């Protein structure tokens, strides 16, 4: 039988963790003064005033590296819980994780062959 009251703590946590950021933004929007001026519209980074055009377009190489990083970062997130519960899950979970890693390795080889990892 599906017991809904067992999920009360989950729903309370979800509502509270969703309400805290919303309340923080609302309170900061109400309490902070709004002053518009040229300083607010200029780019400012690391204490250095920009010289010339501050808007630069990033090369596509940065995005490719970021994409490959995200893929393998997500892989690590999925493999860690699997490794911690390997003895409980058994051989079928090992085969599934092996296929998952194999697919990601094939993707890495594909990116490598296409030159996505070359920095030139």
UniProtKB/Swiss-Prot annotation:
It catalyses: a plastoquinone + NADH + (n+1) H(+)(in) = a plastoquinol + NAD(+) + n H(+)(out); a plastoquinone + NADPH + (n+1) H(+)(in) = a plastoquinol + NADP(+) + n H(+)(out). Pfam families: Oxidored_q4. Keywords: Chloroplast, Membrane, NAD, NADP, Plastid, Plastoquinone, Quinone, Thylakoid, Translocase, Transmembrane, Transmembrane helix, Transport. GO terms for cellular component: chloroplast thylakoid membrane; NADH dehydrogenase complex. It is found in: Plastid, Chloroplast thylakoid membrane. It comes from the Eukaryota. One of its GO terms (biological process) is photosynthesis, light reaction. It is a multi-pass membrane protein. This is NAD(P)H-quinone oxidoreductase subunit 3, chloroplastic. The gene is ndhC. The chain crosses the membrane at residues 9-29, 64-84, 88-108. NDH is composed of at least 16 different subunits, 5 of which are encoded in the nucleus. Its EC number is 7.1.1.-. The lineage of its organism: Eukaryota, Viridiplantae, Streptophyta, Embryophyta, Tracheophyta. GO terms for molecular function: NADH dehydrogenase (ubiquinone) activity; quinone binding. NDH shuttles electrons from NAD(P)H:plastoquinone, via FMN and iron-sulfur (Fe-S) centers, to quinones in the photosynthetic chain and possibly in a chloroplast respiratory chain. The immediate electron acceptor for the enzyme in this species is believed to be plastoquinone. Couples the redox reaction to proton translocation, and thus conserves the redox energy in a proton gradient. It comes from Crucihimalaya wallichii (Rock-cress). Belongs to the complex I subunit 3 family.
